[in-house]
């Protein structure tokens, strides 16, 4: 049932058809995960916590992610102030029933767990990736009709993007009225990234 609800959530909110076979991980004394990026598993990664965080007997176990400012570190750099760890790394505690979804290209890891050798008291999580992004249709519109229009957008996209060095995925939800016009367009999820100097152009393109 959990798998079914997770898949349904990914379809509704991310535009991804499925999830990869999920993994169950248990972190005890000395376990950690160094900073890394997951490529090319899927456009979104997830971590669902089964950890009784409020009653934990260990230290550590937070999910760590580099902040965007670090990934484009020298843009707007100021040498007049010091920088603390919290400004470089985002920490997310694995609280019970928390679902964390993030762009797996961002370097991420897990802070080392110390304080328990008992697997019943460790950092317990289910994790994996949302995969297979593709169109979904609700209503009488046929898949064949929609796909023919989507294929026609391919050439137009090249003109819209131009030389913008964009990478990532964007998912949209929209309705089609009786005249065949798209309306009520909404961005569901967006992992597109560009160098900081080009972000205004990226925002204009996506929005």
Language-model regions, residue ranges each:
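Residues that flank catalytic or metal-binding motifs in active/ligand-binding sites
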Residues: 18-20, 29-31, 42-46, 59-61, ...
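Residues lining hydrophobic/aromatic ligand-binding pockets adjacent to catalytic sites
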Residues: 34, 63-64
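Charge-biased low-complexity segments
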Residues: 79-207
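A short, acidic/glycine-rich surface segment
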Residues: 30-35, 109-113
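Short, solvent-exposed aromatic-acidic interface loops
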Residues: 64-71, 188-192
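Short, conserved beta-strand element in jelly-roll/cupin
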Residues: 26, 39-56, 66-69, 93, ...
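Signature of the catalytic double-stranded beta-helix
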Residues: 1-29, 35-41, 50-54, 194-197
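Short, basic/aromatic beta-hairpin or loop at an interaction surface
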Residues: 59, 66-81, 121
